Amino acid sequence: MKIDIHTHILPREWPDLKKRFGYGGWVQLQHNGKGEAKMLKDGKVFRVVQENCWDPEARLREMDQTGVTVQALSTVPVMFSYWAKPQDTLDLCQLLNNDLAATIASHPRRFVGLGTLPMQAPELAVKEMERCVRKLGFPGVQIGSHINEWDLNARELFPVYAEAERLNCSLFVHPWDMQMDGRMAKYWFPWLIGMPAETTAAICSMIMGGVFEKFPKLKVCFAHGGGSFPFTVGRISHGFSMRPDLCAQDNPTNPKKYLGSFYTDSLVHDPLALKLLTDVIGKDKVILGTDYPFPLGELEPGKLIESMGEFDAETKDKLKAGNALEFLGLERKQFE
């Protein structure tokens, strides 16, 4: 069994959001009729996507070809729209979540959902989270690595974490809104450098902000193998010990003590990195994730895990399926 925790999907179409809300900044999908579409932001091409980004049948064909049993579906992060008016973001979230629920209902043994929330308005986010879990049946939601000016330690977000604990709703944290200009403008740096840095900042903000202390039952998984955190946790821990005046303002506990308290996906593209990741984060806390259907993802899901000679069959099964089931609170028999 292979369960992919990190995949992205869009509706085939949605209303013209600029017309709907009266201002720009929104993403639209422009189809060309050849199994390809342009994601446009204010008329400029953000990304070109193929039909596997919106067509469940195309997705299922590729899942069957690569032996993926289940995909956890989440929106493309550019759709988060935390910058917009909260009620408008809620409207978009509901549109995305309803479409996601319809896709899952058509193939309930192949797909599970991670909803999206208007995180810039925590009171609205809490209500939509409850709807995602109670009405739509999602085991979790996807949130950004920061919410506008808030890092994930912001007290304004604590009601969202409290509700996630209450509902047993898992949180998948995905980097987004990286610096795109200046020194980061060339060489795909926002994706190659910015994303790992964003994820590391998200992990550190939750640790140093005391989020895991205040919400010990919170289940969180960070994308892209936790960014650079697994490799730099020694530096982070040492800095915490040397400068508690700066690092321990909100939580006196050394960051190393939280290893094993959260999950990451497996998307690191390198056997040495995956070995380090499982050693640092724990073999019970790393989950197969591919970033399907995008080119920076793992193109053959689970191939890196399978290639690891030092992993026994039990460990490989945990990484490919068992840890995902644990994180999502689901049973293997639901998908067999």
Curated annotation (Swiss-Prot):
Residues given in the record as Zn(2+) binding sites: 6, 8, 174, 291
Gene Ontology terms: cellular component: cytoplasm; cytosol
Short name of any one Pfam family annotated for the protein: Amidohydro_2
GO MF annotation list: aminocarboxymuconate-semialdehyde decarboxylase activity; hydrolase activity; zinc ion binding
Record bears the keyword Ion transport: no
Binding sites annotated in the UniProt record for substrate: 47
Role of this protein: Converts alpha-amino-beta-carboxymuconate-epsilon-semialdehyde (ACMS) to alpha-aminomuconate semialdehyde (AMS). ACMS can be converted non-enzymatically to quinolate (QA), a key precursor of NAD, and a potent endogenous excitotoxin of neuronal cells which is implicated in the pathogenesis of various neurodegenerative disorders. In the presence of ACMSD, ACMS is converted to AMS, a benign catabolite. ACMSD ultimately controls the metabolic fate of tryptophan catabolism along the kynurenine pathway.
SUBUNIT field: Monomer.
PANTHER family, A to Z: 2-AMINO-3-CARBOXYLMUCONATE-6-SEMIALDEHYDE DECARBOXYLASE, 2-AMINO-3-CARBOXYMUCONATE-6-SEMIALDEHYDE DECARBOXYLASE
Family: Belongs to the metallo-dependent hydrolases superfamily. ACMSD family.
Name of protein: 2-amino-3-carboxymuconate-6-semialdehyde decarboxylase
Gene source species: Bos taurus
Protein's gene: ACMSD
